[in-house]
Curated annotation (Swiss-Prot):
Disulfide bonds: none annotated. The gene is infB. Belongs to the TRAFAC class translation factor GTPase superfamily. Classic translation factor GTPase family. IF-2 subfamily. Residues 419-429 have a biased composition (Gly residues). It comes from the Bacteria. This is Translation initiation factor IF-2. It comes from Nitratidesulfovibrio vulgaris (strain DP4).
Amino acid sequence: MTENKTKVKDLAAELGVTTKELGQVLKDMNISAKTSTSVIAQEDLPRIKERVQAQRDGGARKEGNPDVIVRRRHRDGDRASARAEAKAPEQEATAAMPETSAPERAEEADKPAVAKPAKAPETEAHARARKEPQAEPVKARIIRRPDEPAPVAKVVEAAPAETPAPEAPAVKATVTAEAAPAKTVEPESERPQADKPATARVVRPATPDASAVPDGTSSAPTLPVRSAEPSDTVERADADADGDDDDAQQRRRKKKRRQPEAVVPQVRVISRPDPAAVAQQQMQQQAAQQQREAGGYRPGGQRPEGGYRPEGQREGGYRPEGQREGGYRPGGAPRPEGGYRPGGPRPEGGYRPGAPRPEGGYRPAGGPRPEGQREGGYRPGAPRPEGGYRPAGGAPRPEGQREGGYRPAGGPPRPGGAPRPGGFGGAPGGMPVPGADGRGDQSKKKRQKGRRTVDFQADGPRGRSDDDVMRGPRGRGKRGKKDVRPAATQPLKAIKRKIKVDEAIRVADMAHQMGLKANEIIKVLFGLGVMATINQSLDIDTATVVAGEFGYEVEKVGFSEDDYLVPKEEDAPETLVTRPPVVTIMGHVDHGKTSLLDAIRKSNVTAGEAGGITQHIGAYHVTTKKGEIVFLDTPGHEAFTAMRARGAQITDLVVLVVAADDGVMEQTREAVNHSKAAGVPIMVAVNKMDKEGANPDRVIRELSELGLVAEDWGGDTIFAKVSAKTREGLDELLELIAIQAEILELKANPDKAARGHVVEAKLDKGRGPLATVLVQEGTLRQGDAFVCGVFAGRVRAMFDDQGRKVKEAGPSTPVEVQGFDGVVEAGEEFVSVADDKVARRIAESRAVKQRERELAKESKVTLETFLSRRADAAEALTLNLVLKADVQGTLEAISEAVRKLSTEKVKINIIHGGAGAITESDILLASASDAIIIGFNVRPTSKVKDIAEQENVDIRFYDIIYKLVDEIKSAMAGMLAPVQREVYLGQAEVRETFSVPKIGVIAGCHVADGKVTRNAGVRLLRDGVVVYTGKITSLKRFKDDVRDVQKGYECGMGLENFNDIKVGDVIEAFEMVEEAATL
């Protein structure tokens, strides 16, 4: 340690924290410190101390947060209660002044009571959101003394014009004799409601008029109706619940002066109609029908002349649709004889806003009210003249805005043949609806071909109510005809400008959803460089771009595997347990990775590998004195790049093995890059320290150039010097791994569905598809359903790395799983799911997507791909291959290595590749495509061999990857094996033979021509016939070994495994020269 650096353990002791806590702080600050002996730069110390102190202060502050939340909740309640007490006297005082305008009183009572008019139609989602807070009891509040005249408020509804269908009574402002002082909102199931969107009632106060109150009629108190805001409703309810004495007195006064007509609109709640109410409605409807057929007078009282009728609101309270004196008036039932509107008859001389309507005029049935904004109680049109009536008011009011709300288009019509109260009935059933029969045809003419038509069906949420459907036709004759509602042709509203797309959508379907013509979308696609037809499928990304051009949003619908595979919530800290570290051993080929693992496992894996090199990725669970460790052994050969990358991605720690006598090699650099890309910490093990030429300093120097600086040199990379052969330094290496794992705090939740990655996959002849799975979280049990890549399955059996059968596997446990539907790709994520149906659904969805991606790649034709397909016949030399390997990872490595061998003159085309034994279908495929079958660690059956001979298919077998690559290179040189040429060197004549014990016969020769070399091949000729062909074992001149003997000299020559040498034989020397066929 230098003067300007401090060790981690010393700083931890100084700050009074554990090394583990300090390690976490350093990790958050991106200060590299792997062990407690790591050093920290002096300039970093102030920042670290500030961070540790800030964390202590932050922990102290967090402890008080829950109390603050609780206290805030109490303050809200107190404030609401105080506000309620303060408002009651003000409201009474305000109500005592009759000349004060109602808007001012409403603002003084509670300013949020007056809501802004809604500018756009509400969706059902908005209605539900508004409806939810109304489930709590809502207390009615009296804001004036009973002896004062009631302020008259204008009610603007956000609902369509109603039929006399059953409707939920609003919450009463006054309390009936049988009810409690404040009536709460009933549950939805108990309300006889029309099946329509629930909308909040919004009240706009109007100017009071003393003349509006008739003599002899005591009016009930009228309440300013609050908008249905959840926060305000809850606050008011809390304030009343706290016990407001003044409110209690007002409620008692209210009980004495009960008026059955006065109701307070609070909110309309949708529910199914009550069967008892429906039966009563049907009876009343039949009576009304009989009266209408008889042409009788419709009771209800004659409207006084010139009565003041502020729009929608009568003096004395609110009159919802279908509500008449005496309570609920369902479905066109007659009003009791002599009945009157709740607010009383209109006195003479009253003012009705609007221009005077001509005497005797009437508003024909079915005439739509003009769209537009009505403000301030103004009613366009004219007051109905004396004795006038509105016959057959069955036309729906078109969509239009009134202040305080809106009336959606297509609302239910008013009951046919029902004149306004005070009017006189016309013909039975009223006058027929002009144009009612032709509205459907008219709306069809208005439809534009390129615009979306929105039809609100009769049985939909805005059509006939449920009790209308139960009643059936409403009459006979012309009245019996079904109501024909116009189909509104309109572009989608802004809130509805969304199209729903699955993984892909056709151009025609997209045009239909957007209300456009298909050629408009095709025009945009052409501008994007996509040649599309009306039936072309667009992926979701392209559809999003196209929809954006027209101002639409894309909503992805359909099956989503994320709903099943993505964890719903994070694991709670108390559910996490410590898991063993996953350590990947990486390095260059022949640097001793597997031998080092053998020494740790005390086994012999290397002996089982062909050629002594690792060609699979192996997972091993090792129990050491320092705890359990999971090792992944990766291949070092250059062809296994993908395997090394995969090993780095699913590991916690990488041990980089470098031979002390060899130094840093190409695959060593690649392993370092893979580990850095995966963000995995690296520990270096310098192996082969027992060799004479070991030079660990050279390794440290070369690795420092790659960014791995040893701790001895002031860096943070841990170096361990080991020898797999002598087991030197293994305990130190295991201890360093255990310390590093402790710093990383590796934890996982074992009590959840298993999730992991496939390390290796293969096809076993007896057990079917197998995969080595490293479980990373959860516990995998026998019988669990799972999905992996495009395959689903159920765990039939599990085996550990020793081949023993196990029932379950926890986090950081490698197991071999049996039960796949096919051979999965190595590196795929393995996820356990609830049942087989979900697994199969996800697998099928992935398979369809994969096929679509493959088809999309094939359909894309560029200039380069087009020209590459038109090579000349002389140059179009292609080597077709069918690759079969034992495991999926090896197949991937071989495929990649073989593809790299392609040159401009010879292309390699892999017709098919798969894991498992060579089958009959492989032979037939190779025969049809003139391909060579390459088998790696697999063998065919005798039947398959016979078929191969019949089909003249060449099968090559390999067990070492670099031999496979070399032979393919040779085959590419001339589409055949390398050419070997024999070169003549010289001749020697045998003049004498000598028999040497333990060696054999030695020929004494004289070189007659050329020369004879020691490594040359020889051919023994006797009377011109070749008797022996072999090699020279010894070549001596006198007693000295020589490399060659020139012409004219004598020598002694021994032949390999041949002693029948006779005087007079001729020995011809030659050598074989390999020459690759030129292309």
